[in-house]
């Protein structure tokens, strides 16, 4: 999947998860549901994850994925149907930079 008109100003850093076991850092971002291009009408927003090795926090080493998020009411929210997201290195660098600032 690709996102047309990607804009970091429309993205919010939601969480960071460091895995000592796998030696990775995963960043989670909330983005507009419109970026899913209507594929998931029940989505409340788009979730983007960026995962990279702890010893190489660089865009070229990152894996980027995207998922719709749905509201489960009292049970909270659920990210589902994860898929690979193709992004430019500069956009990935911008997302990693958001977590560093």
Where in the sequence are the language-model features?
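Extreme N-terminal leader/activation tails
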Residues: 1-19
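Short intrinsically disordered terminal tails
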Residues: 1-4, 74, 97-101
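Acidic, low-complexity, intrinsically disordered interaction modules
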Residues: 19-91
């Amino acid at each position: 999947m690709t996102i047309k008109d990607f804009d970091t100003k429309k993205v919010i850093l939601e969480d960071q998860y460091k895995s000592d076991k796998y030696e990775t850092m995963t960043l989670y971002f909330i983005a507009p549901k419109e970026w899913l291009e209507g594929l998931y009408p029940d989505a409340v927003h788009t979730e983007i994850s960026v995962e990279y090795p702890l010893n190489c926090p660089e865009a070229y080493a990152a894996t980027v994925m995207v998922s719709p998020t749905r509201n489960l009411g009292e049970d909270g929210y659920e990210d589902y149907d994860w898929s690979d997201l193709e992004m430019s290195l500069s956009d990935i660098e911008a997302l990693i930079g958001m977590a560093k600032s």
